[in-house]
Amino acid sequence: MSYAIIETGGKQIRVEPGRYYDIELLPVDEQSTHTIDKVLLIHDEDDISIGQPFIEGATVEGTVIQHRRGKKVIVYKMRPKKKTRKKRGHRQEITRFMIDSINYNGKTLVATAATSSAEVVEDSSDEEE
């Protein structure tokens, strides 16, 4: 299993090719590709590369699926024994980001096509019946 740890939006996220993640809002259009070059760690089977703080030449490429808003967080302030109450809500702007590949030293780590192999298994079980 190959994965990388990247930094985006002030947070560190463990990402794998072929999966999507909700990250802080990226200033790019939907359905466009984006490259993140702040890669802190890459784990490829038995090989681990750690940056100080980032790995030079390592990138994570992905596609912006959509821009959306996160769950609403309610902030409620109240002073006891007074009639002072404030209720406010906040919804964070987030981007759903699909990881396409992890690139390092000319090597590209891409997700395997698990869905196509699952379809083959379903087709072979139909033929047996």
Curated annotation (Swiss-Prot):
Any one GO MF term held by the record is: rRNA binding
Q: Which domain of life is it from?
A: Bacteria
Which terms does the UniProt entry file under GO BP?
translation
Gene Ontology CC: cytoplasm; ribonucleoprotein complex; ribosome
Q: Which InterPro entries match?
A: bL21-like, bL21-like_sf, Ribosomal_bL21, Ribosomal_bL21_CS
Q: Could you list this entry's UniProt keywords, alphabetically sorted.
A: Ribonucleoprotein, Ribosomal protein, RNA-binding, rRNA-binding
Question: What family does the Swiss-Prot or TrEMBL record give for this protein?
Answer: Belongs to the bacterial ribosomal protein bL21 family.
Record's subunit section: Part of the 50S ribosomal subunit. Contacts protein L20.
Q: What does this protein do?
A: This protein binds to 23S rRNA in the presence of protein L20.
> What is this protein's name?
Large ribosomal subunit protein bL21
Gene source species: Microcystis aeruginosa (strain NIES-843 / IAM M-2473)
Q: What is the lineage of its organism?
A: Bacteria, Bacillati, Cyanobacteriota, Cyanophyceae, Oscillatoriophycideae
